[in-house]
From Swiss-Prot:
Function: Probable ion channel inhibitor.
Protein name (record): U4-theraphotoxin-Cg1a
Cleaved propeptide residues: 20-39
Main location (coarse class): secreted
Free-text comment about domains: The presence of a 'disulfide through disulfide knot' structurally defines this protein as a knottin.
GO cellular component, one term: extracellular region
Similarity-based family: Belongs to the neurotoxin 36 family. 01 subfamily.
Subcellular location, record wording: Secreted
Tissues where this protein is expressed: Expressed by the venom gland.
Keyword annotations of the record: Disulfide bond, Ion channel impairing toxin, Knottin, Secreted, Signal, Toxin
Keyword Secreted belongs to the record: yes
Taxonomy, superkingdom: Eukaryota
Source species: Chilobrachys guangxiensis
Coiled-coil segments on the chain, per record: none
Amino acid sequence: MNATIFALLLLLNLAMYNAAEQSSETDMDDTLLIPEINRGRCIEEGKWCPKKAPCCGRLECKGPSPKQKKCTRP
């Protein structure tokens, strides 16, 4: 009796593990890329760039100190 219950629990565990592993695979069509998430909230050239929002396009956040960074061209 105990062996039967143990075998059933083992099979159930394997089935749940396989189902979880298959569902964890992500499809690129279902995921949003970072530029799509931040669309409309990017910082333009010459503006201060805080950590919360990225610079628009190919601009980079550069400056002499962390508090004086601005979005500039690379």
